[in-house]
Protein backbone atom coordinates (compact mmCIF):
# COMPACT_ATOMS: atom_id res chain seq x y z
CA UNK A 1 0.00 0.00 0.00
CA UNK A 2 1.35 3.41 -1.02
CA UNK A 3 2.09 5.67 1.95
CA UNK A 4 0.85 9.24 1.67
CA UNK A 5 3.84 11.30 2.65
CA UNK A 6 5.16 14.71 1.74
CA UNK A 7 8.40 16.67 1.77
CA UNK A 8 8.61 19.86 3.81
CA UNK A 9 11.21 22.57 3.85
CA UNK A 10 12.88 22.39 7.26
CA UNK A 11 11.94 25.38 9.38
CA UNK A 12 13.46 26.46 12.69
CA UNK A 13 10.63 25.03 14.82
CA UNK A 14 10.80 21.65 13.02
CA UNK A 15 14.58 21.28 13.07
CA UNK A 16 14.59 19.41 16.39
CA UNK A 17 12.27 16.72 15.00
CA UNK A 18 14.60 16.11 12.06
CA UNK A 19 17.81 16.00 14.11
CA UNK A 20 16.29 13.38 16.45
CA UNK A 21 15.67 10.88 13.64
CA UNK A 22 18.03 7.89 13.73
CA UNK A 23 18.90 4.94 11.52
CA UNK A 24 19.56 1.41 12.77
CA UNK A 25 22.92 0.81 14.46
CA UNK A 26 24.20 -1.23 11.52
CA UNK A 27 23.42 1.70 9.17
CA UNK A 28 25.21 4.46 11.10
CA UNK A 29 28.35 4.22 8.96
CA UNK A 30 26.29 4.77 5.80
CA UNK A 31 24.81 8.21 6.51
CA UNK A 32 25.79 11.27 8.53
CA UNK A 33 23.58 12.39 11.42
CA UNK A 34 20.95 14.87 10.25
CA UNK A 35 22.38 17.65 12.43
CA UNK A 36 25.71 17.26 10.58
CA UNK A 37 23.86 17.34 7.25
CA UNK A 38 22.15 20.61 8.13
CA UNK A 39 25.51 22.10 9.10
CA UNK A 40 26.98 20.88 5.79
CA UNK A 41 24.06 22.51 3.95
CA UNK A 42 24.65 25.80 5.73
CA UNK A 43 28.33 25.94 4.78
CA UNK A 44 27.69 24.74 1.21
CA UNK A 45 25.18 27.56 0.79
CA UNK A 46 27.04 30.35 2.60
CA UNK A 47 30.65 29.57 1.70
CA UNK A 48 30.39 27.87 -1.69
CA UNK A 49 27.14 29.29 -3.06
CA UNK A 50 25.75 25.83 -3.76
CA UNK A 51 21.99 25.45 -4.06
CA UNK A 52 20.93 23.01 -1.33
CA UNK A 53 17.41 21.81 -0.53
CA UNK A 54 17.05 20.00 2.81
CA UNK A 55 13.61 18.49 3.40
CA UNK A 56 11.90 16.66 6.20
CA UNK A 57 9.95 13.61 5.09
CA UNK A 58 6.57 13.60 6.81
CA UNK A 59 3.76 11.09 7.24
CA UNK A 60 0.98 13.42 8.26
CA UNK A 61 2.64 15.65 10.89
CA UNK A 62 5.10 12.93 11.95
CA UNK A 63 8.71 13.34 10.79
CA UNK A 64 9.85 9.97 9.40
CA UNK A 65 12.96 10.89 7.41
CA UNK A 66 15.28 13.43 5.86
CA UNK A 67 16.49 14.09 2.33
CA UNK A 68 18.89 16.74 1.08
CA UNK A 69 19.28 17.61 -2.58
CA UNK A 70 22.00 19.83 -4.02
CA UNK A 71 22.69 21.31 -7.44
CA UNK A 72 26.06 21.39 -9.17
CA UNK A 73 28.25 19.96 -6.40
CA UNK A 74 31.96 20.58 -7.03
CA UNK A 75 33.08 17.69 -4.79
CA UNK A 76 30.99 15.16 -6.73
CA UNK A 77 32.37 16.55 -9.99
CA UNK A 78 35.89 16.19 -8.59
CA UNK A 79 35.53 12.70 -7.06
CA UNK A 80 33.47 11.05 -9.77
CA UNK A 81 34.18 13.17 -12.82
CA UNK A 82 30.50 14.12 -13.12
CA UNK A 83 29.39 16.76 -15.59
CA UNK A 84 28.47 20.24 -14.41
CA UNK A 85 24.87 21.28 -13.81
CA UNK A 86 23.43 18.20 -12.16
CA UNK A 87 21.21 17.45 -9.17
CA UNK A 88 22.62 15.30 -6.41
CA UNK A 89 20.77 13.50 -3.63
CA UNK A 90 23.38 14.32 -1.04
CA UNK A 91 21.75 12.77 2.03
CA UNK A 92 18.80 10.46 2.51
CA UNK A 93 17.54 8.53 5.51
CA UNK A 94 14.38 7.04 6.95
CA UNK A 95 14.12 6.76 10.74
CA UNK A 96 14.65 3.22 12.04
CA UNK A 97 11.04 3.03 13.31
CA UNK A 98 9.66 3.66 9.82
CA UNK A 99 11.92 1.55 7.63
CA UNK A 100 10.43 -1.27 5.57
CA UNK A 101 7.05 0.45 5.26
CA UNK A 102 7.40 2.05 1.82
CA UNK A 103 8.38 5.51 3.04
CA UNK A 104 11.81 5.44 1.40
CA UNK A 105 10.54 4.56 -2.06
CA UNK A 106 7.78 7.16 -1.94
CA UNK A 107 10.15 9.83 -0.57
CA UNK A 108 12.56 9.23 -3.44
CA UNK A 109 9.71 9.52 -5.94
CA UNK A 110 8.73 12.86 -4.40
CA UNK A 111 12.35 14.04 -4.44
CA UNK A 112 12.65 13.12 -8.12
CA UNK A 113 9.41 14.95 -8.84
CA UNK A 114 10.86 18.02 -7.08
CA UNK A 115 14.13 17.78 -9.04
CA UNK A 116 12.18 17.60 -12.32
CA UNK A 117 10.82 21.10 -11.58
CA UNK A 118 14.46 22.22 -12.05
CA UNK A 119 14.45 24.62 -9.06
CA UNK A 120 18.11 25.60 -9.56
CA UNK A 121 18.29 25.23 -13.33
CA UNK A 122 17.99 22.70 -16.11
CA UNK A 123 19.85 19.40 -15.88
CA UNK A 124 19.91 16.10 -17.68
CA UNK A 125 20.54 13.96 -14.62
CA UNK A 126 20.17 13.39 -10.92
CA UNK A 127 23.02 11.58 -9.20
CA UNK A 128 23.51 9.94 -5.83
CA UNK A 129 26.07 7.64 -4.29
CA UNK A 130 26.09 4.95 -1.62
CA UNK A 131 28.47 2.71 0.26
CA UNK A 132 29.15 -0.60 -1.54
CA UNK A 133 28.06 -2.55 1.57
CA UNK A 134 24.69 -0.78 1.75
CA UNK A 135 22.58 -3.36 -0.09
CA UNK A 136 19.30 -1.89 1.18
CA UNK A 137 20.04 1.50 -0.36
CA UNK A 138 21.28 -0.09 -3.58
CA UNK A 139 18.09 -2.10 -3.98
CA UNK A 140 15.90 0.93 -3.29
CA UNK A 141 17.76 3.21 -5.70
CA UNK A 142 17.62 0.67 -8.51
CA UNK A 143 13.87 0.17 -7.93
CA UNK A 144 13.15 3.85 -8.52
CA UNK A 145 15.22 3.97 -11.70
CA UNK A 146 18.78 4.90 -10.77
CA UNK A 147 21.49 3.12 -12.76
CA UNK A 148 24.86 2.33 -11.20
CA UNK A 149 27.88 3.85 -12.90
CA UNK A 150 30.52 1.31 -11.95
CA UNK A 151 32.82 2.81 -14.59
CA UNK A 152 33.12 5.87 -12.32
CA UNK A 153 33.53 3.90 -9.09
CA UNK A 154 36.94 4.14 -7.47
CA UNK A 155 38.28 1.96 -4.69
CA UNK A 156 37.40 3.26 -1.21
CA UNK A 157 34.67 5.49 -2.64
CA UNK A 158 30.90 5.31 -2.71
CA UNK A 159 29.22 3.85 -5.79
CA UNK A 160 27.70 6.56 -8.01
CA UNK A 161 24.31 6.07 -9.66
CA UNK A 162 22.40 8.26 -12.10
CA UNK A 163 18.81 8.87 -13.08
CA UNK A 164 18.22 10.57 -16.43
CA UNK A 165 15.70 13.40 -16.10
Whereabouts are the PLM-identified features?
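Acetyl-CoA-dependent GNAT
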Residues: 4, 9-91, 95-97, 114-118, ...
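Conserved beta-strand segments that form the floor/walls of ligand-binding pockets within enzyme
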Residues: 88, 93, 127-129, 160
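Active-site acidic-Proline motif in GNAT/NAT acetyltransferases
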Residues: 95-97, 101, 132-133
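Conserved acetyl-CoA pyrophosphate-binding loop and the N-cap/start of the following alpha-helix
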Residues: 98, 102-110
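Conserved beta-strand-loop-alpha-helix junction that forms the acyl-donor binding cleft
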Residues: 122-138, 154-158
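Terminal substrate-recognition subdomain of acyl/acetyltransferases
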Residues: 142, 147, 152-165
Amino acid sequence: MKKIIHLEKILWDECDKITKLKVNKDQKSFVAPNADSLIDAYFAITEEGIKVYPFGIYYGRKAVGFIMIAFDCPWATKYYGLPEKFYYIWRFMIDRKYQGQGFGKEALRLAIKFVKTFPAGKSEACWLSYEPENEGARSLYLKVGFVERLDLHKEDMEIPAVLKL
